[in-house]
Design a protein with these regions (language model features):
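N-terminal secretory signal peptides that target proteins for export/translocation
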Residues: 1-8
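Positively charged, low-complexity intrinsically disordered regions
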Residues: 8-10, 28
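Extended rod-forming repeat segments used as scaffolds/tethers
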Residues: 9, 22-23, 104
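Bacterial N-terminal signal peptides
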Residues: 12-22
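Catalytic cores of phosphodiester-bond hydrolases, prominently lipid phosphodiesterases
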Residues: 27-391
Length: 391
């Protein structure tokens, strides 16, 4: 049955309960008629994939790292399918790591191919046509030169995949797109005397280009932006704490862009106080003018719950570096899920259990989204948010 039809039937059922209550002389609030009118996007909880683009290490690079840096290999030993498949299986937060490449070609010839050849290993397959990497525009990868295979390339192509899926499923809860701006701060290639590709620095003008690429794919009516959330308030922090985030009624079928790197926020805000005119929500310090979205990836449940109660949108990681997945340790996962973090990120979403232990991060009963365990209103109904996954 189509989800829109299911929601219509549920709405009719809620209407029926409302009328029965009226006949019985009760005075229920009119807001019970439609949860979309009352439930806000920070009052739900969804599962996200960490490094959603990550196609896994190429065979030669993997062998090389196993020999030289087994610890690094272990932390990178995971992969995801294409973005549409992830969305089909209930992932509602995607993470895309991007490198600026304003002239094109900066990442067209990765050092890893030379290192593999020098080690006498078979050449790795080319993950995408060279002309894609020669054109100007933001590129998607984990680490330049060694971990560069992605399920989509370039950044615009990844966004187009999300847009196509969203257009085909217009009733979805908002899709959160976390953007990690990779740069020189991310360090160098371990254990090599060879120079690796120096990333292009992030400047206000580079961020202008990033906003332009996003806007070239998503029209204003398909995004939730800082300006929309701020409204007439002076700051975003004031808006989310006093007035709240948009309701599901205003957010279905849309995307929200979030910035991963806290250091990039001040650069992104130059000339854009409180993110005026910008597309992404920064990973901000609570109480600051851009305060709306916060990352608490260490999984401190008390801190997360306090932030959620204050009105902030929080992303937290249930696992990292394949550590929990190798042992099946679910303690961090369970803390994060119960903390109220609206976005729970993992390398192992419901359809991708860890091959070592079966470790997985999923909402109960196959849910794609659930009412937030900390701040959801009484009007929130899990089955109203999105249909449960059939598998």
């Amino acid at each position: 049955m189509d989800f829109a039809v299911k929601r219509l039937r549920l709405a009719s059922a809620v209407e029926g309960i409302f009328l029965i209550a009226m006949c019985a002389g009760a005075q229920p609030a009119a807001r019970t008629r439609n949860p979309d009118d009352t439930v806000r996007i920070n009052q739900i909880q969804v599962i996200g994939s960490h490094n959603s683009y990550h196609a896994g290490l190429l065979p030669g690079i993997a062998k090389l790292l196993q020999q030289k840096r087994p610890d690094v290999f272990a932390s990178l030993d995971y992969a995801h399918p294409d973005l549409a498949t992830q969305l089909n299986h209930g992932v509602r937060q995607l993470e895309l790591d991007i490198f600026a490449d304003s002239r094109g070609g900066l990442y067209a010839h990765p050092l890893g191919t030379k290192l593999v050849a020098q080690a006498g290993l078979p050449a790795d397959p080319v993950p995408y046509p060279e002309d894609v990497m020669l054109k100007p525009g933001f590129k998607v990868m984990h680490v330049q030169d060694i971990d560069y295979a992605s399920v989509c390339q370039p950044f615009v192509a990844c966004l187009e995949t999300v847009r196509a899926w969203s257009n085909a499923h217009p009733q979805h809860v908002p899709i959160f797109i976390l953007v990690e701006t990779k740069g020189i701060r991310d360090g160098g290639l371990p254990d090599t005397e060879h120079p690796w590709t120096v990333p292009e620095p992030w400047t206000p003008s580079v961020f202008d280009a990033l906003d332009a690429e996003i806007r070239s794919v998503f029209s204003p009516d398909k995004m939730i932006t800082p300006d929309q959330v701020r409204g007439r308030n002076h700051t975003l922090d004031q808006a989310v704490r006093k007035h709240g985030w948009p309701t599901l009624k205003k957010a279905r079928g849309k995307v929200i862009f979030l910035m991963d790197q806290a250091w990039a926020g001040p650069i992104y805000m130059e000339g854009h106080p409180a993110l005026r005119g910008r597309v992404l929500f920064t990973n901000a310090t609570p109480g600051h003018p851009d305060g709306a979205f916060v990352e608490e990836n260490d999984g401190n449940a008390k801190v997360i719950t306090a932030l959620v109660r204050r009105g902030y949108l929080v992303r937290a990681q249930a696992d990292s570096d394949t550590v929990e997945a190798r042992t099946g340790d679910v303690r961090r996962r369970d803390r994060v899920l119960s903390s109220g973090a609206q976005i729970v990120s993992t390398d192992y979403p419901p359809f991708e259990p860890a091959r070592w232990s079966g470790y997985v991060v999923a909402l109960p009963d196959g849910l794609t989204a659930q009412c937030n365990p900390v701040n959801a209103p009484s009007t929130c109904v899990n089955s109203w948010l999105e249909p449960a996954l059939s598998h």
